[in-house]
Design a protein with these regions (language model features):
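Conserved ABC transporter NBD signature motif
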Residues: 32-39
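Helix N-cap at the start of a conserved alpha-helix in ABC-type nucleotide-binding domains
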Residues: 152-154
Length: 174
């Protein structure tokens, strides 16, 4: 149901990440059908599914491009599910939107749009990844143990941020 938070529980190697990868389209299924909001997406690629699926990975270094700036990463996320050309996305209107969104993190990143993503700590990158996942509406947000690589204090911050973003956007989350 829309807005529900579903938790998948299992031991290491049980297939939790594989399950999320099949939903995202990065792994093809051998049989069965995957439907998102009543639409059969089984044969659609990960890029085609990106219109409906947002994702935050376990590894804070995944899901962002360390060689690109914060604003370039956010511009790519803003174009999720579309052809991704940075040039048209890096304009004053979008920069203001990115600053506004980043300000909710209270990490002063709204003043560092031109810094390379690789300069951020793991916790900062994970917070930005979560924010990037919510820039465009999606039908489902996949969180693959997105706090596992973080220290306890940062993990608590990212979980609080997750709750806020999921609630504000009424996201269905796994």
């Amino acid at each position: 149901e829309e807005g529900e938070f579903v938790t998948v529980i299992g031991t290491n190697g049980a297939g939790k990440s594989t399950f999320l990868n099949t939903i995202a389209g990065t792994i093809r299924v051998d049989s069965g059908k995957i439907s998102l909001n009543g639409i059969d997406v089984t044969k659609k690629t990960a890029h085609q599914r990106a219109h409906w699926v947002a994702r935050v990975f376990q590894d804070p270094m995944a899901g962002t491009c360390e060689g690109l700036t914060i604003e370039e990463n956010m511009a790519l996320a803003y174009k999720r599910g579309e052809s991704r050309f940075l040039k048209g996305s890096l304009n004053a209107k979008n920069r203001e939107l990115f600053r506004e969104k980043l300000s909710i993190l209270k990490l002063n990143l709204e003043n560092r749009l031109t810094d390379r993503m690789g300069l951020l700590s793991g916790g900062q990158r994970q917070a930005v990844s979560l924010l990037m996942a919510s820039l465009q509406p999606s039908k489902i947000l996949l969180l693959d143990e997105h706090t596992a690589a973080l220290d306890p204090k940062t993990a608590a911050f990212v979980l609080e941020l997750t709750d806020r973003i999921v609630s504000e956007n009424n996201l269905t989350t796994m």
